[in-house]
Amino acid sequence: LLKVLFLENDSLEYIPFISNDPVFPTIEYGMDTKQINDKNQKLIEENKALFFDLVKQKKLSLTVHNESGTLMQQVIEESRFADMMLVKSSMSLSYEDDQNPTSFVKQVLAKAECPVLIMPEDSQTINEIYFTYNGSHSSVFAIKHFSYLFPAFKYLPVTVLYVSEEKNDQEDKQINDIRELLYAQYKHVTVKVLQGTAEAELFSELALKKNVIVTFGAFGRSTISRFFRKSSTNSILQTIDIPAFITHP
């Protein structure tokens, strides 16, 4: 069952107003509630019509919820009863939020009670799977949940990116364990051991990839959260243009 949330943001935008003073013209910002509401309502109705046309073409079964008020709370409550949530990395409740991922998306990642699939702007066919793995409970948790949700992907090639940031006596065992788990579900599995910092190594591996999907084991609860912080190379989600499956125990 596909469930769709239409979220209506109650916050207002600032609109520029130019003064009529011919000598000292100024620009001030104010709120034109009627203009904003009319513009937003028209856009909402147009997007809904496009969406329902697509659903009809694809012959999908779905339920629709129209949500307003405390939107984050509504989203999290809905996630409790969902197998997975799809969110665009650019989704925002504020016209000023130009981060990628946005503040809204970061909150969803940290608070959602189901896996979240962060979608790039343009859809793409998935031809390969990348699992990030460091032996932790959260990384295995993400891999297992992804496999449960996408059984049709079992014939796609899988690459496990194992990042070894420091000497680890359990490395061989951890690699053998993940191989054993994945060989039972996938036909083509490769484990690639990366040496160095997780951010740099994963960025190097994923930066130029297309038509792939990647899993991360946590957000805000382990070193995985570092990938989404601003840095000299920007956040990994801003730089890589591929779907990212993110969840935490």
Residue ranges and their predicted role:
Residues 51, 55, 179-182:
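Conserved hydrophobic residues forming the short capping helix/wall of the S-adenosyl-L-methionine
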Residues 27-43:
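A short acidic, glycine-rich active-site loop
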Residues 55-63, 184-190:
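A short helix-to-beta-strand connector/capping loop
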Residues 179, 196-208:
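A short, acidic, amphipathic alpha-helical segment used as a generic capping/interface helix at domain edges
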Residues 1-31, 111, 124-193, 211:
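Small/aliphatic-rich secondary-structure junction motif
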Residues 11-14, 72, 96, 126, ...:
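Generic structural signal for helix capping and beta-alpha/helix-loop junctions
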Residues 66-73, 194-199:
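Charged docking surfaces used in two-component/phosphorelay signaling
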Residues 64, 72-122, 206-209, 213-249:
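Gly/Ser-rich helix-loop-strand patches that form or flank binding pockets
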